Amino acid sequence: MTHVVLFHHALGQTPGFHAFADRLRAAGHKVTAPDLYAGATFTDLDEGVAHARSTGFDVVRQRGLDAAADLPDDVVWAGMSLGLMPAQTLAQTRPGARGALLLHGSVPPEALGSPWPSGLPAQVHVMEHDDWGDVDDCRALAAAQDEVELFLYPGAGHLFTDASSVDHDPAASDLLLERVLAFLQRVG
């Protein structure tokens, strides 16, 4: 069993987000899912991003860091889209992580103020033509780090793992989950 700390995307903790977390739990993993939005959820990505913007992206990120303060170090930090900000920050700055799962994009490590940790395994999952997912940043991270695997999926949907999102792609989501579970087995 691996402990996964999963940060939600800009739509908040939607039913599809919870369903994804439950699939990890059903495979035997412990999942902690901090709520960065204090219960708010959205069905439209632009509205969710507007909420994050009005709250302040730094505030949203800090909520994630604060939520992780009392959690153990030997976890897998996972973030979906907006949730990448706290997940990737913690993976890069908090020693002891087992790995990182960067779903629906990634952030250039230098934008978070520190390099990618040597030897830290990670997976990046994004659709090839995702306008929100910064595919070039994902490619650059994987090219620069031997421990980072990049998985590109056909299509343009952003939140394709969220069954309650208009972007949901069941086949891509199932393949992603298969790869994530293999990763968790390997690093656990």
Regions found by a protein language model. Name each.
Residues T2-P72, F160-T161:
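Serine-hydrolase catalytic machinery in alpha/beta-hydrolase-like enzymes
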Residues F20, G133-A143:
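Short alpha-helix in the alpha/beta-hydrolase fold that links the catalytic acid
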Residues A78-A87:
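Gly/Ala-rich beta-loop-alpha elbow adjacent to hydrolase catalytic centers
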Residues T89-G99, P115:
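Conserved hydrolase catalytic core segment
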Residues G96-V107, P121:
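A conserved short beta-strand
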Residues W116-A122, D146-E147:
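Short, proline-enriched alpha-helix->beta-strand connector loops that line the catalytic pocket
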Residues V124-V126, Y153:
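Short beta-strand/loop motif that positions the catalytic acidic residue
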Residues V148-G188:
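C-terminal catalytic histidine-bearing segment of alpha/beta-hydrolase fold enzymes
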